[in-house]
């Protein structure tokens, strides 16, 4: 269900909503594309306010309507963010993978996948399983390398971790 206000107290969100509404009126799109974007915009607004259940409902509806793979990748990415936030890491990884299938140029998805893998590696260490931890850390390294390859100036902490752990080649 589209939000009636559409604009919250955040200046950036207000600006985004205003620009989005203007673009919806002037760019030639089908009614389905406009409706999908409206749900996506409402999902982003709900997500920024911490209303994750509402955000997911809007994103799922946007996915039902959106046909463009590139646009779908961002919807899937945002669904992954919510699952990450909720501690549902397996679901989050699934949505990040699905986003990357449609758009392999999402460094933030690679980064988030790396963060989850690194976290799981730390959990394995706490549980005393260094072999499993090493596998998770190696997977994190691969994802961070992909993120860094796409945006070399970003993810400085990840670059430092890769160097310190001798995983950067």
Curated annotation (Swiss-Prot):
Keyword vocabulary terms for this entry: Chloroplast, Membrane, Photosynthesis, Plastid, Repeat, Thylakoid, TPR repeat
InterPro entries: PSI_Ycf3_assembly, TPR-like_helical_dom_sf, TPR_rpt, Ycf3/AcsC/BcsC/TPR_MFPF
Localization per Swiss-Prot or TrEMBL: Plastid, Chloroplast thylakoid membrane
Membrane topology: Peripheral membrane protein
Repeat region (TPR), residues: 36-69, 73-106, 121-154
Domain of life of the native organism: Eukaryota
A GO-annotated cellular component: chloroplast thylakoid membrane
Gene Ontology terms: biological process: photosynthesis
Pfam families: TPR_1
Described purpose of this protein according to its UniProt entry: Essential for the assembly of the photosystem I (PSI) complex. May act as a chaperone-like factor to guide the assembly of the PSI subunits.
Family, per entry: Belongs to the Ycf3 family.
Protein name (Swiss-Prot/TrEMBL): Photosystem I assembly protein Ycf3
Organism from which the protein derives: Cucumis sativus
